[in-house]
C-alpha cells in the first residue's frame, strides 16, 4: 500500500490541494483523502508538481518509430505521404522492432498508460504485448487499390484490444470503407481533415487529386461531397468513432457529425505532427465552442521530433491547464471506451 501526494491533484477536472491518494500493490486506487496540510502526514510519498492520472495517447503509429528524423519538415501533406512510401523500405525488421521498443519506453516513463495505436502489420505486436502500457491496436486499411479488409480483420482477431479501421476519408474506396465501418465493436480511428487537400479532392482539384490523376487512380466516393458527409453517410450512428487531426474542420463539419452520432465523436489533436508536416494548427477554439470532446495524440516519429504527450500539451493554444490535462487523460480514455477504469483519479 502506498500513499501519494503532490502540490496539486487533478480531481474531476479541477486542481485541488491537500489530496492524498492511496493505491494498493496492483496500482489500484483504494482511497482519496483531503487534508488541510500534508506536510506532517506519516508515510506519504510527496512529489512536486501535479498528480494526474496516467495519460492516454489517443493516436499513435508506434510502428513508424524507426523513421525518427528520416523525413524532412514542411514537406506538405501529399509530400509527406509520398516520402513515407519512399523511405520505409530502407530499414530492417530488427531496426523497426528496436525503435518501437525505445519509443514504448519513452512513453511509459513520461506517464502514458494506454495508447490507441494504428498498425499495418503485426511485426511489433510482441513489443506491445510485453509493454507496461495497455495498447488498443487498430489495423488500418489503406490504399485506393485495396478491395477487402480481410487481412485487417484477421490480424485483429489474433489480439486483445484490437480491431480494424479505415485509414481516412481520402485513401479508401467506398465498399471497403463501409465494410469496416459496419463490422466489429472497437472504435474506428479515421484521419480526418488534416489538410485542405482532403476537401479539395471531393471537388476534383488540389494536390491529392493531381497525384491520384497522375497515377490513374479513380475515387468512387467523391459523390458524398465532403469528408464529413462521407462519414455521416457511411459510419453507423452507434459506432464509437475517433477523428484524428481535424486541422481544417469547420463548425459545419462538427455540427453535422454531432447530429449524426448517438455519442459525438472524439477529436484527437496532434499539434506537433501538424506543425512538422504543414506548419498548421488544429482549430481548438472552434472545437471547444462546438462542444466537441477533445483528446490528444502524439502521431508518429515520422512526423514529429518527439513521441511526447507533454510536448503536444505545450503546443495547444488558448486553453487552461486543467482542460489540457483532461484532454490528455479522461477524454483519451473516453475515446478508447475505458473511462470506467482509466483516465481519472477516483476510487
Task: Name every feature range the model reports, one short phrase each.
Residues 233-237, 280-347:
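His/Asp/Glu-enriched, well-ordered alpha-helical/loop segment
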Residues 35-52, 183:
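Active-site metal-binding motif and surrounding structural segment of the metallo-beta-lactamase
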Residues 1-39:
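N-terminal metal-binding scaffold of metallo-dependent hydrolase/deaminase domains
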Residues 66-98, 136-139, 195-239, 260-261, ...:
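Active-site gating loops and adjacent loop-to-helix segments of metal-dependent hydrolytic enzymes
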Residues 112-233, 246, 250-252, 276-279:
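Histidine/acidic-residue-rich, glycine-tolerant segments that coordinate divalent metal ions
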Residues 132-135, 183-187, 236-241, 256-268, ...:
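Glycine-enriched alpha-helix->loop->beta-strand junction motifs that scaffold or abut catalytic
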Residues 22, 50-51, 66-131, 152-159:
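Alpha-helical scaffold segments that flank or form the walls of functional sites
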Residues 53-65, 187-196:
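Histidine-centered catalytic micro-motifs
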Amino acid at each position: 500500500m502506498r500513499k501519494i501526494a503532490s502540490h496539486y491533484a487533478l480531481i474531476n477536472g479541477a486542481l485541488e490541494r491537500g489530496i492524498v491518494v492511496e493505491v494498493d500493490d496492483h496500482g489500484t486506487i483504494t482511497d482519496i483523502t483531503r487534508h488541510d496540510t500534508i506536510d506532517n502526514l506519516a508515510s506519504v510519498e510527496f512529489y512536486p508538481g501535479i498528480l494526474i492520472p496516467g495519460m492516454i495517447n489517443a493516436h499513435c503509429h508506434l510502428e513508424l518509430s524507426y523513421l525518427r528524423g528520416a523525413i524532412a519538415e514542411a514537406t506538405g501533406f501529399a509530400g509527406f505521404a509520398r516520402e513515407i512510401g519512399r523511405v520505409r523500405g530502407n530499414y530492417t525488421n530488427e531496426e523497426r522492432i528496436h525503435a518501437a521498443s525505445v519509443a514504448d519506453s519513452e512513453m511509459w516513463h513520461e506517464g502514458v498508460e494506454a495508447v490507441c495505436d494504428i498498425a499495418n502489420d503485426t511485426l511489433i505486436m510482441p513489443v506491445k504485448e510485453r509493454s507496461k502500457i495497455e495498447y488498443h491496436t487498430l489495423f488500418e486499411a489503406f490504399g485506393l487499390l485495396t478491395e477487402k479488409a480481410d487481412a485487417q480483420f484477421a490480424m485483429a482477431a489474433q489480439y486483445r484490444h484490437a480491431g480494424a479501421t479505415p485509414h481516412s476519408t481520402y485513401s479508401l474506396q467506398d465498399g471497403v470503407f463501409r465494410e469496416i465501418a459496419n463490422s466489429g465493436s472497437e472504435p474506428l480511428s479515421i484521419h480526418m481533415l488534416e489538410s485542405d487537400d482532403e476537401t479539395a479532392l471531393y471537388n476534383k482539384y488540389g494536390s491529392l487529386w493531381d497525384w491520384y490523376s497522375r497515377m490513374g487512380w479513380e475515387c468512387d466516393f467523391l459523390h458524398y461531397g465532403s469528408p464529413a458527409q462521407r462519414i455521416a453517410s457511411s459510419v453507423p450512428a452507434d459506432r464509437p468513432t475517433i477523428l484524428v487531426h481535424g486541422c481544417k474542420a469547420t463548425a459545419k463539419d462538427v455540427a453535422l457529425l454531432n447530429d449524426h452520432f448517438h455519442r459525438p465523436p472524439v477529436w484527437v489533436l496532434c499539434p506537433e505532427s501538424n506543425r512538422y508536416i504543414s506548419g498548421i494548427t488544429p482549430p481548438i477554439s472552434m472545437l471547444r465552442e462546438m462542444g466537441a470532446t477533445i483528446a490528444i495524440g502524439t502521431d508518429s516519429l515520422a512526423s514529429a521530433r518527439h513521441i511526447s504527450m507533454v510536448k503536444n500539451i505545450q503546443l495547444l493554444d488558448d486553453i487552461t491547464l486543467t482542460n489540457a490535462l483532461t484532454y490528455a487523460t479522461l477524454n483519451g480514455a473516453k475515446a478508447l471506451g475505458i473511462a470506467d477504469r482509466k483516465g481519472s483519479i477516483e476510487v
